[in-house]
Amino acid sequence: MLNDILSRVARVGAMHAGNRPNPPDDRPQPCRGKPPTSPGKTIKHKSFLGALAGAVAGALVAAAVAAAAVFLVGVTGGLAVAAVGALAVFAAGDLISAVTNKVSAMVDSASPAFGPVASGSGNVFVEKQPVARATKDTVACTKHNSPQLIAQGSESVFVNDAPAARIDDKTVCGATVKEGASTVFFGSGQGTYLDIADEFSWWEKALLIAVEFLVPPSRGMLKGLGKLFIRGPKAVLRGSRAGAKWIAGRLADKSSCASKAFKASSGLTRAKAAVKAFLKDPVYIASGEVIESRTDIELGQTLPLAFERTYRSASVHIGLLGRGWHDSWSEVATVTRDGLNTHVVITLAQGYDIDFTFHQDVQAVYCPHYPEFTLHRRGDGFSLWHRDQQTWRDFSVVQGERRLLSAIHDSHDNRIELVRDPKGYLRQVRHSDGVTLLLVWQGEFLHQIQRIDGGQKTLLAEYRQDEQGRLVEANATQAYHLYYDYDAAHRLTRWHDNDQTWARYEYDAQGRCVYTTCADGFLTARFDYLPDRVVMTDGLGQCSEFGFNDLFLMSWEKSPLGHVTRYEYDDYGNLLREISPAGRVVEFTYLDDTGRVSTFTDASGHQWQYDYDAAQRLCGVTDPLGREWGWMYDAEGNPERLTGPDASEVRFTWNRYGLLTQVSDAAGEVQARLQYDHRQRLLSATDAESRTRQLRYDGQDRVVQWQRADGARFRLGYRRASWTLPEQLIRPDDKEEQRQYDRHNNLLSYVDGNGALWRQTFGPFDLLTARTDAEGRTWHYAYDKESQQLTTVIAPDGSHWQWWLDADGRVIRERDMTGTETHYDYDEDGLCIRVRNGEGDTRHFLYDARGLLLRETAPDDTLHYRYDAVGRLTEVSSSTAHVQLEYDLRDRMVREWHNGTLLTRQVDDAARTVTRTLTWDGDADDTINALAPLTSLFHYTRTGELRQVQLPDGADLTLTHDAAGRESHRTGGSGFVQQREYDVMGWLTREMSGAQHDGHLLATQTREYRYDGAGNLTGVRHNRDAEGYRLDATGRVQEILSGGAGKPVDTTARFLYTRTGLPQEAGRLTEWQAGRLVQHDDTHYQYDRAGRLIRKQVVQPGYRPQVWQYRWDSRNQLRVVDTPNGERWLYRYDPFGRRVGKRCDQKAEEIRYLWDGDQIAEIRHYRHGQLIQRRHWVYNGWELVVQQRQHTGGDWETDFVTSSQNGTPQALFTPDGTLRWQAPKATLWGQRQAEKSESPDPGLAFAGQLRDSESGLCYNRFRYYDPAGGCYVSPDPIGIAGGESNYGYVSNPMCWVDPFGLAKCPTLAHGANGEILSAKATVSKAELRTGSGTNQSSRDYARSLGNQTDDAGHILGNVLGGQGGKGNVFPQLPAINRGQYRDFEKVVKDYIGQHGSVDIEWAFKYGNGGTRPTEIYYDVYQNGQKVFGRIFNN
């Protein structure tokens, strides 16, 4: 909702007044007369600043930068995420780092896509995919930290009261929807309902980045930001580029702008405000028009060169393509004279008209209704300035009263020329980036568009008209091949793609669409146009109502359940107030004449203030805490300097084309350098450690080669001349990977480096219907016809996971594959207020005006939450715990107090260090044991890699990285050394640990790794012992082979798997029921109605049964364990679900834990109330690297830890390099074959797992894992988001890990330098939103692999259940991490929410070598079929 509101605000000011609070992410967005888009569909940043429509690096960079800027400007999405989490967007990093990273990320972006559409309608589907809607749904733009609202949509088609989002529609961050349905088209005409960030303005991007810091963390705030940054700051920035003349004349000109268009159906403002009015296919309910809009071509590196076409059923216009069709190159100015006044009507590509009136001697007209447009006289022609896009449109070709479009250009002289013949026919389109298009005519209409620069003759689009001049076929080779049917009145009655998708329309006598339906019954609706409202009845008979004001802006909307949202506007259509159904109110004020937001007040009364300079550029922001951010600009209007509340600075350098070339800090230290070729395509990006990644392109500006800093090259191949998605990847090891897509850009199949084939099947509206893995297992998916939300997942064994929705499309009941049911209730605003589990335990939730959780009430406890003015969580309390949090000026958590323990952090940005101190109450008074606080100092490189840790006892651990940024050496104490080697793919091949003597390593532990073509681990040699793994096509272990020097090769274990992938070891009894383990050999398992293990019994002949009993609380936290020997262990947790203690009264023992984020930092062991031992742990990511032990009264003993590839500690070394302890052998699933109680043993299992000897389980942060059965003992807290199996661990524990017991995070395949090469994960619906944020340790680790300014980016996103530990992070540009990547994750989340579990695979490319990836390949599969994928530049 926030995203939608922001988008609407940005585009129209107040027109976005129709979004429902928290609309289902999977609801489709309204389409604009083009193929409707849906979750998972690709978005791209246009060549605004070089963002190639396809996947050119230059475009990527421009797109990335633009996206970042947009992201910041429209902070609509990113902030929303931050708000929801109650944490500042930049909580993980400083302002400078964040900004630098974002800019760098944008620059590094070389992928053809910037993320997917993240959400859609919950009840309207096209091609079985939820239809995305403008102003309501978001995209996961990899350039932003948060979801970005779709800002544009159909002008005539609305879905759930929101304009349908389609191909070519833009998001508030400036990205363009690139994919959509292949057979369905929604309402022509493109309405802009929210402000759109300038993709062309790099400096604006910087501003946007800054804005990110300003975005209030509340939902309401996010809404305001959308309006503010898109319409305000962005407009200001654009205005600055327009020049001082525009500023000087705006006051005199504004009064001359005609407002009649505003009230007429052709008014642009009306269209923007009506975005919300697009329902179902592309029906614009405000007028009843059907609007079909599509973008067939997108090219260009600087200025976006796009060909957009829009059909409007009520239009009599005849354009290049035929009757009723408008297009980008047919925009025209129509001039009429009335005495001394000159009236000019500008007709835009979306079919809208804007009226301007020039009085005598007036040279420029500014329209208060459309503050983004200013019209200037230019001799006999006119120039239209679009401040939001920072572009000029010249209308200088005279044809009677008409002035044809002749050029489009920006403030940096990037230019698109439209070359016409003497009769006015458009013959060529030439871009200053070097692109030339040839237009081929057939009679009076356009027949073909060909690209002819560089000697090529590539067909980009082909059209065919019937005898009556109506477009009947459109074949955009980069997008869709569509067919159109019309009635006798030339109104569109049907469109289809000759495949599975189609849409049909019926009209009344007034030409209004009264009925529409689509393939398979999706998006069916009937419209009744009443005098005071419009009533829409969907295919299930559910009614929604909408009211409009005199400006045709939605003034209220009523959901099927009767919830009413109201909107109030000023005379110019700016949104003043939005009142949710529950009465939550957000407010905006604006600067006179400019439409710039001056203040935003959230629902709790907290206010943000915005200041502008004389050029109307945003120059200052003040948040409710009084923190201030400021911007300074160069002579060209580019942002030159950004200053944060702590006086830190980020400086930017730009080239003559407006492209970012350098980012540096206040001291002049360069953080990133970017270089472009003569066509403004990004050629290379160099980070702060001088690691350079390089890109190469073909004649169509597609990336064909990416080179890491270490020289490794990845080559990309394309199936056909105009295809923009690479379908072939030749890796540095000469292995080939293949992908096959359909015309809708749906991934149909994927062949990995082993030749294993995964397949996917799609239905109407590109909804995934089946996924088959490489072993032939198939999952099927079913959807709700109205919301297109996933309602059923059918596993290969026939078991079902189902969801039931209410009339508003919200999940009210869920039943997993074991039959466990969960029920949900919501308030009027869509906030979940009750959850009831299978045992009948109910948890109640209360929220404040901002939608932030205030109280959680359960039968066994009540939690209270407090926040500061900007929405940061500051305090949480329960009956047994009290937590207080403090932040610095950059929103970094610097103090966490919990029941007597205190964790503090001191950050020195100049020195790139973080000092962590652990303190316990009472230690200062304990003079006997001298328990001093534990202080550790972490040092980082300029790119963020952990470089050194100085420990409390004076010892230190130093990490060294190679040219590719991979960890190559570790040295600690007086002699400990570890060396790592990598292959050409960057996968770790050898790791040697031991002592250093005379400059040489005397290794006592050597581990060598071998991989298959898909990057799966197939063998490990440990000293003289070797173990091999025979895998199936999906990478699961089938056999374990042992051997070694002088030893025969034996098969030590064989594994089979159920149809759903659960393990069954050959020769052993393993029984699963509906995905839950019920018997393993002699061990029997019993569960309660909530699906939690309550009894484990071991029955062996001749012995008494051994019984363990387990008791859980309402939050599914294990509280009590009764063991066979009569012991009872009690577990305690903090409000965040972290276990902070356990005790056994029978043994008089107690263990307490002090946490640093999601990792244990210190453990204290008490006996009879006396402290007997404590341990201090230091992590790098999820890998334990240092353990320190101290017995009461003794000295500290330091152990340097080496771990296996899955995070399991393998050995401990003394500071002099002597082997002190090595782990006993364990089974594939982690069960130790011989338990030893050696004191040095850290007691850790797989990454993130702490062994509990009393229960035989492993504490896994959010759940408990049973290594004997290889599964969890309670349902996944995040549901199907964690995978189709609610209890299963990972598919292959040698390659995958699950550090938090939530998502199935992959075990990372590392390269020779320690860089991450690949990762895999399975995410189910239950895992959604169960992830955790990064901690200082993981951030340090990520930066140790990359740059000091990098974010610790989640490989598997927080929203997907990914944890923030070292095992799930990598160095990532902030702009990408918080922008495109995060937006894409939301798309994935929405898809999972609708379609169920998915398998995710990542491949990391290192164009500059080192350990910092420059490109991330992110592919999502379902049932073996690739659902969608993206490539992220970094």
From Swiss-Prot:
Region described as Disordered = 14-42
Q: Which GO terms describe its cellular component?
A: membrane
UniProt keyword annotations, A-Z: Hydrolase, Membrane, Nuclease, Repeat, Toxin, Transmembrane, Transmembrane helix, Virulence
Q: Transmembrane residues, as ranges?
A: 48-68, 70-90
Tell me how this protein sits in the membrane: Multi-pass membrane protein
> Which E.C. number(s) belong to this protein?
3.1.-.-
Effect of deleting the gene: A double rhsA-rhsIA deletion is outcompeted by wild-type cells, restoration of rhsIA restores normal growth in competition experiments. Restoration of growth requires the RhsA-specific immunity protein, rhsIB does not restore growth.
> What residue spans do the YD repeats cover?
486-521, 592-628, 847-876
List the subcellular locations: Membrane
Please give the Gene Ontology molecular function terms for this protein.
nuclease activity; toxin activity
Q: Pfam families of this UniProt entry? A: DUF6531, Endonuclea_NS_2, PAAR_motif, RHS_repeat
What CDD domains does UniProt report for this protein, alphabetically? PAAR_RHS (cd14742)
List the NCBIfam families hit by this protein, alphabetically: Rhs_assc_core, YD_repeat_2x
Q: What's the stated role of this polypeptide?
A: Toxic component of a toxin-immunity protein module, which functions as a cellular contact-dependent growth inhibition (CDI) system. This protein may be a nuclease that is specifically inhibited by its cognate immunity protein RhsAI. Upon expression of the C-terminus (residues 1284-1434) in E.coli growth is inhibited, cells elongate, nucleoids condense and plasmid DNA is degraded; these effects are blocked specifically by cognate immunity protein RshIA. Cell contact is necessary for growth inhibition.
The family classification in the record reads: Belongs to the RHS/WapA nuclease family.
How is this protein named in the record?
A: Probable deoxyribonuclease RhsA
- What is the gene called? rhsA
